[in-house]
């Protein structure tokens, strides 16, 4: 499966305002997935108000994760997911919905669960078939407060890079034994990679042995050997980079 990052503004530029712009972009990828039999997992990489303070979540101006402090932003996220799910409810190449990429804020275990429940409740009003995927707090890895499972078609996800859990015994006990076997739910690693080839191969084999699904991150990059695909920077692309950088 290919994990596809989404920005909420492509589907809902303002609160309670829906847009089809994002579907115009996604539909070409859906056609590609159908053509080559590649499942797609839709991933909310940037949520209203931002789910962490990193640049990839589009944290605005003050660098805060205001998804957790604004009920309006939480409703906005849930309504956006309902909009997306309603559009793709009958699309078989869509494997599931990754509700929130790498949430990160201290002391929000209860709030994070409430956000997920709002999103799932909204999705299930229009789509009872697709999987819903939830990530733990602290960039996907702390699932405190997210048990027991609260949907019959739920997947628990975590991310793994060098610098995280380094021994496979601890990882097995925390994820395979502590989540999948205890609660009878599937596991999926939504991100791993961008380290050495040897490390990547070894951890992939660990996932495969333990029936843990995975998706390499990221699938395509610019002039890097750590991605599955890489492309060269063209003169036109460099001009764009220079413009963004103010040169």
Where is each model-derived feature located?
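An active-site-proximal structural segment forming one wall of the substrate-binding cleft
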Residues: 1-2, 12-96, 115-124
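Short, solvent-exposed turn/loop segments enriched in Gly/Ser/Thr/Pro and often Arg
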Residues: 5-8, 44-52, 136-138, 218-223
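A short, flexible beta-alpha/helix-coil linker loop
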Residues: 8-12, 102-105
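Extracellular glycoside hydrolase catalytic/binding regions
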Residues: 72-222, 226-243
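Intrinsic low-complexity, glycine/proline- and repeat-rich
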Residues: 245-247
